[in-house]
Amino acid sequence: GRPSARYDAPYCSQEEVRECDDDCSGNPVRDACQCAYDPAGSPACDCYCVEPWRR
């Protein structure tokens, strides 16, 4: 899964967030994007699509 639209600043780049938004905009149900830093310690930003009300 991928975490929240409250972007975790040092880890999620604007580009990643924008890409996620693009990916999710075509999704009929989960058309909102959530991004968050992976707490496992990986420097990656984790993004996924969620229902808009879950943001």
UniProtKB/Swiss-Prot annotation:
Post-translational modification: Contains 4 disulfide bonds.
Compartment annotation: Secreted
Chain residues in the propeptide: 1-5
Main location per the UniProt record: secreted
Recorded GO CC terms: extracellular region
Entry keyword annotation includes Transcription regulation: no
Tissue specificity comment: Expressed by the venom duct.
Domain-related comment: The cysteine framework is XXII (C-C-C-C-C-C-C-C).
Function per UniProt: Probable neurotoxin with unknown target. Possibly targets ion channels.
Name used for this protein in its record: Conotoxin Cal22b
